[in-house]
Amino acid sequence: MKLWLLALCIVAVSAVCAAPVAFWASSPVGPDETVLLMGGNWGDNPVVELAPLSAPLSAPAVFTRPPTLGQWKQIKPVQITPNALKFVLPVTTPPGVYACRVRSADLSPQILLNAPDPWWLQGDEGKAASLGGWVRLFGRCLDMSADCALALRDPSGKVTPLPDLKGDQWNVRATVPASLAPGDYDLLLSSGWGTATAGKLTVIPPVKWKTDVFNLADFGTDPTAAMQAALAKAAENGGGVVYIPRGRYQIKESLTIPPGTTLRGEGMALVSLYWPDFETPPDALIVANDCAIENLTLYCQNHRVVIRNDPESERLRVNKVRIRANAFFMFGEPGAPFRGKNPPPKMMDGHVFRLSGRNYQITDCDLWGSGAVFSIDPHRFTGTKGPWHGVISGNTVAYGSTSHVFENLDGLIYEHNDVRGRGTSAGGNGINTFWNNFSRNLYYANNVIHDMYGLDREMMTLDAGGGAYFGKIAAVDGNKLTLAADPTYKDYAPTPHTDWSGAAFMILDGTGAGQYRLVTRNEGRQWEVDKPFDLPPDANSLISIAPHRGRHLFVNNRFEDGGAFQLYGGALDTIVAGNKGARMDGFFAWGLNPHDWGWQPCFNCQFLDNEITEGNGYSYRSAFLGAVTGNNNELYPGPLARAIVLRRNVLQSNARLRFGGTISDALAENCIVKNNEIGVDIRAAANGVLFRNNKFENVTTPYSGDGVEKAMIIPAPK
């Protein structure tokens, strides 16, 4: 590996980066809206040049004909900082994809606006899609017109458009034709405005388990013995269906469902399996690896885990299952005996699901747990086998402690769930990296989340301190970087892990600030990332290596009666769009250094078309939407939030906009604030902030705070 001494590195990087560079743009963006470009080396008096891509074609021709550029037009920026440039798209700009470049003494490489930006794909079998199954694609600017199309391209170059396409700008879904040949394909997307190759998809035959039926009624009258015998027979057979006819069945032991086996009841309302109130419950009531459970109800009292799968599991399906898991059934409070029986000492014990395997689906279930309901939580460093590629959809969820703990995600579809805190101590919901290097690629959409009054009551939070390095670099060679000092690994384990593959290698400040890459390999001071930086770091750059929580899509959810929706402790490339909130603490990004274990900034977070209908609640403050930071000190006083965009949000009934802390290069545009003393709270530590075309109705002081004088404010036309 080629290494450079620090002095040589500085000279080489300076030579490479003399021209302007733009590495991120705030897509989607429309006419008369502001584009935020992140980059640097703008030079003196830079101008932006914009050119449209050719008009869209229909599939499949759109996938085989390259687009052409129209005429370049120049636009003068409205705000320039060392790391960002803002300009307004002319009101006459037609919708579409545009090539953008910055011209000063030199010309920057092109960056595209509104081009499809695929983040990840997922099939009905996790990383794969089955013939006749589905594939979904997630990201930015995906379905922008009626000409949107998905297609598969085989190794010979043949392109097959996919039918049954549905979607929006954040996700697109289509059916995989049953007539295709199994194999590896390129997934192609046309948004209607532009095209992109979205990744590799493996197409497989439908998964077929054996259908031999083992009727519980044929195995005796003792329910526990009959169940164990039927499961054993299915295991001996290599799988099958253990069928449970109408009835109530007391089960006194833990059950292990064999691989390839479906535990199927006659109906959710017709079949009940119930366990006694164990003084010492088993580790799990049901161990479910590579199997399915459907059409029945489970009742239990004291429990550790109701349904568990393990890291080796590669397929789990749970559909139309009702679960009532109340460890405090017929008790008044934790630790207080009643009628000679003792309840658990703590409210937080117990999990309905504890999943560590891959390719799981929990759909159309009715779930109530006195502790946690969804613990996608291996509670350890997973390495190359994490709880990845899941679907949790269409469920009714009630809980006593927490609805979900999501740790080490990579591809989770969490949608159309109704989630209610039930109990005075029902707390919040987390997406975490306590033990691991990442939680990424989450689609969290069309859920209703409500009634959380316990603990921190976060309606949704990213969480966990952790880090591997803060400091300078000694050398750069493409995607290989040499740290200037030894890394220091910190996480929640007694002995922190040292393999940081998948973590975020972030440029906090200095040259290239606001960029990040994903770690692919590390050993001592030698680190490799997934691709070179567009604007490489140099001796002036400050680096933070910390867990990657990002590429999350929070879309069209409703949050009521709870605490904050917060991108806490760092978020990268995160969309918060179309959500509604009432009687909550608001929606905001929050960059900081939890526990002093690692600096975790917020980069590229966009809050679009959200609404807070009621800004009052239990909190000492009114609700707000925006960004804040914390924990800055003499070691690092610089920005912990960059490229924050607030657009078309509505804040009502004592809710407001807020930028507080070390925020750099942010935008608030076309937002509306109604019925409040203050419309916008802006603090002096924020730099490079633009407020444009925001409107205020019945607001005493539209702009307030010690940062007003530093901000650029362009009032809305009257």
Name each model feature, range by range.
Residues 75-87, 165-174:
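Aromatic sugar-binding surface patches on proteins
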Residues 465-482, 491-493, 536-542, 669-674, ...:
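Acidic, glycine- and Ser/Thr-rich low-complexity intrinsically disordered tracts
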Residues 228-233, 249-264, 272-319, 346-355, ...:
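Extracellular beta-strand-rich solenoid/capping regions of secreted or surface-exposed proteins
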Residues 91-95, 176-183:
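Surface-exposed, short loops/turns at beta-strand junctions within beta-sandwich domains
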Residues 260, 264-269, 289-300, 314-343, ...:
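Right-handed parallel beta-helix
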Residues 123-125, 453-538:
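Autoprocessing Asn-cyclization modules and mimics
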Residues 18-71, 97, 104-150, 195-212:
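Beta-strand/beta-sandwich contexts
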Residues 216-245, 256:
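Acidic Gly/Asp/Thr-rich repetitive segments characteristic of extracellular carbohydrate-active
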